[in-house]
Structures are given as structure tokens and as C-alpha cells.
Curated annotation (Swiss-Prot):
Record's protein name: Ribosome maturation factor RimM
The keyword RNA-binding belongs to this UniProt entry's keyword annotation: no
Matching HAMAP family: Ribosome_mat_RimM (MF_00014)
Organism in which the protein naturally occurs: Clostridium botulinum (strain Alaska E43 / Type E3)
Family of this protein: Belongs to the RimM family.
Keywords: Chaperone, Cytoplasm, Ribosome biogenesis, rRNA processing
Length: 165
């Protein structure tokens, strides 16, 4: 399992005092409020303040004190250690842990590896690219078992839930 998570990407500067504008890579941006320290390029950095602006997070990070300083951090990722990540509710998983899991149907037919997880308003969707592109809705009646330790997910046979149109 990954021990370091990307939780955001610095996309721009904000103001003249070294704040950075962050595109969050997490559904719950309120998680940023709980952060005390993050990693940028493998270096520990203390968070001094967190604000929100539309769909972005504005961070003041210790050691980034001018707009010129902040400019050098554009496109860099903000990461945290798994041990600092918030605890998940039962039956939920970090996307980073799902990516790369092999998906099988209940008949033990291999469907492929999860390439990405797409978040939609109603439910997440597992995206498999190989050997054949397949989008699997993450619903309790379709996803039967998730075994993160063994990187294995079992779903109902596709013919039972996919439209043939």
C-alpha cells in the first residue's frame, strides 16, 4: 500500500505574502483544515493557515513568504503520510489503494486492473482500460468484495448489470 498520498496540487500563487492556490485531489476539502504538516518534494512543511476559495484551497505554508517564493512551487504536489490521513468510514477505501487492484467477476473471470476511480454525484465508478475498457459502477449490488491487502475486487458478472445497447 502507498504510504504517501497526494492530496492536492499547487496551481498558482495567491496574493503577495506567499500563499498558494491548491487544486484539491480529495472529495472532502475540509480535510485540509486538520493538516498541521505536509510534504512538498519530500520536505516536511508546516501549514500556517487554510482558507477556501470556490473549488480551491488557499494555503499559507511555512517558508514560502513571497509571491516569488510561491511561484517556484507551481505544479508541485502536496502530500501527506498515510498515518496522518483521516480515518475512513467502514466499507470505504482510499482511491490510491484501489488503483491497480485486479477485478474479477463472481465466476472468477479476470476483467482487468483498475486504472482510475471516477467520482460522480451518485456513486464512484471503477475505470478499467485493459484488456477491454470497462466502467464499473461502485454499488453494493454490483461490487461484491474488496480485498485491498491482496489487491483483488470481485463484482457481479458484467452480463447481469450492464446494458447491451
Amino acid at each position: 500500500m502507498e504510504e504517501i498520498f497526494k492530496i492536492g496540487q499547487i496551481v498558482n500563487t495567491h496574493g503577495i505574502k506567499g500563499e498558494v492556490k491548491v487544486y484539491p485531489l480529495t472529495e472532502d476539502v475540509n480535510k485540509f483544515k486538520k493538516l498541521k504538516t505536509v510534504l512538498i518534494d519530500g520536505e516536511h512543511r508546516n501549514i500556517q493557515s487554510v482558507k477556501f476559495q470556490k473549488d480551491r484551497v488557499i494555503l499559507k505554508i511555512e517558508g514560502i513568504d513571497t509571491m516569488n517564493d510561491a511561484e517556484t512551487y507551481k505544479q508541485k504536489y502536496i502530500e501527506i503520510f498515510r498515518s496522518n490521513a483521516p480515518e475512513l468510514e467502514a466499507d470505504t477505501h482510499y482511491i490510491v489503494d484501489l488503483i491497480g487492484c485486479m477485478v474479477y467477476d463472481a465466476d472468477n473471470m479476470e476483467l482487468g486492473k483498475i486504472f482510475d476511480v471516477i467520482s460522480t454525484p451518485s456513486n464512484d465508478v471503477y475505470w478499467i482500460k485493459q484488456p477491454k475498457e470497462l466502467l464499473i459502477p461502485v454499488l453494493k449490488d454490483i461490487v461484491l468484495d474488496i480485498d485491498i491487502e491482496n489487491k483483488k475486487i470481485v463484482v457481479k458478472p458484467v452480463r447481469q448489470w450492464q446494458d447491451e445497447d
